[in-house]
A protein has these predicted regions:
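Well-ordered alpha/beta subsegment
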Residues: 88-119
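Residues that form generic nucleotide/phosphate-binding pockets
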Residues: 10, 27, 111
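Amphipathic alpha-helical interface surfaces
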Residues: 20, 24, 51, 108-111
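Amphipathic alpha-helical segments
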Residues: 15-34
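A short, surface-exposed helix-loop junction/capping segment
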Residues: 1-14
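Short, conserved beta-strand/beta-arch hydrophobic-aromatic motifs that form part
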Residues: 38-95
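A general boundary/transition motif marking the beginning of the first structured unit of a protein
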Residues: 12, 16, 100-103
């Protein structure tokens, strides 16, 4: 995992995003303890060692929360999906906007488990 300083710098001035990230990271590490995070310029990567999910700031400054991105082969329509972007005929990129720490729940971990298995 990257150092605390990189994580603090990435979420500087964004307390809600930081709280959502910590809840998500705690749930992911509870399910997959070998998972590592890497803080990059525009996102934080979750991998073990290959990446399976990314979190980033929302696309618009007026939006609150944290954007979680992962890839699925055949995502079923879900109202919690913020956006689904087809990459090709067999794969789509899924974006989920997390607006509270409680949204890092069992349903979301199931989606991430599917993304981990399909990469």
């Amino acid at each position: 995992m990257d150092g605390i300083f990189e994580t603090v710098a990435f979420f500087s001035g964004r307390p809600l995003e930081c709280a959502v990230f910590e809840a998500l990271r705690t749930r992911i590490l509870g399910r997959w303890p070998q998972t590592q995070t890497q803080v990059m310029k525009t996102c934080v990567r979750f991998g073990d060692p290959r990446p399976f999910a990314y979190v980033s700031h929302p696309p618009r400054k007026s939006m609150e929360g944290l954007l979680l991105t992962f890839s699925l082969r055949a995502p079923q329509a879900q109202e919690r999906y913020f956006m689904v972007v087809p990459v090709n005929s067999r794969r789509s990129t899924v974006h989920v906007l997390l607006q509270s720490p409680g949204e890092a729940d069992g349903w979301l971990l199931g989606q991430l488990e599917q993304a981990r298995n399909e990469r």
